[in-house]
């Protein structure tokens, strides 16, 4: 148990996968535009609300994801393939430079204009803790389902939300330094990492399904 608790390569891979999937740097321009009418204090409150919501959503996915799959009779290998396809699709949109705009539909965009609090919707859900991040968390939680691993993932999610909070606090400064070109470059790099992670999900799922089909 102690060995799994200190299995830092697994936790690091999970953390990097979340970072690439959510791509908080790419969401910064969206965050700035959505909070442009707010005071500095209100923007900080929105930032805290959004990232706390992200952590809660991913924690629920981590601990209850396997139960939800069993409730609907979905095998983890099938879910790995579906999640991998979704992750690859998001990665392709990131590489093409869409900056995650596919995560929010037209109705959600129109509702944003009249919504007083945007911290939970649409920032936390679906822009950050969207289907890709949720499915990825469920896959990791079911693959490494011991208490020690789940606690490690719990801490990794908390650190991820903390990092996103810090990035959003520095949002105006980062936009001035990186400019749109720099943000686009980072987004494409994250997209490549994300595509590799999605393909790994698909391959793992296929390996799990085919032995059953051959029996």
Curated annotation (Swiss-Prot):
Subcellular location: Cell membrane
InterPro entries in alphabetical order: Multi_antbiot-R_MarC
Membrane topology of the entry: Multi-pass membrane protein
GO cellular component, one term: plasma membrane
Protein family membership: Belongs to the UPF0056 (MarC) family.
Domain of life of the native organism: Bacteria
Membrane spanning stretches: 14-34, 54-74, 81-101, 120-140, 147-167, 189-209
Protein name listed in UniProt: UPF0056 membrane protein YhcE
Keywords: Cell membrane, Membrane, Transmembrane, Transmembrane helix
NCBIfam families the UniProt entry points to: NAAT family transporter, PRK11111.1
Primary gene name: ychE
UniProt source species: Escherichia coli (strain K12)
């Amino acid at each position: 148990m102690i060995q799994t608790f200190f299995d830092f390569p697994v936790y690091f891979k999970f953390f990097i996968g979340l970072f690439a999937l959510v791509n908080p740097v790419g969401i910064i321009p969206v965050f700035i535009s959505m909070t442009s009418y707010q005071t500095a204090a209100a923007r900080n409150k929105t930032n805290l609300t959004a990232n706390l919501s992200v952590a809660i959503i991913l924690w629920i996915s981590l601990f209850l994801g396997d139960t939800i799959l069993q409730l609907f009779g979905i095998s983890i290998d099938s879910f790995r393939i579906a999640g991998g396809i979704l992750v690859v699709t998001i990665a392709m949109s990131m590489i093409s430079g869409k900056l995650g705009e596919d995560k929010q539909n037209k109705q959600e965009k129109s509702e944003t204009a009249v919504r007083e609090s945007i911290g939970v919707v649409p920032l936390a859900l679906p822009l950050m803790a969207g289907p890709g991040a949720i499915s990825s968390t469920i896959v990791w939680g079911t693959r490494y389902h011991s208490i020690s691993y789940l606690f490690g993932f719990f801490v990794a999610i908390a650190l991820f939300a903390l990092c996103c909070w810090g990035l959003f606090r520095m949002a105006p400064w980062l936009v001035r330094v990186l400019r749109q070109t720099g943000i686009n470059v980072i987004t494409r790099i994250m997209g490549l990492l994300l595509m590799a992670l999605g393909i790994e999900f698909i391959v793992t799922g296929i390996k799990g399904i085919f032995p059953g089909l051959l029996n």
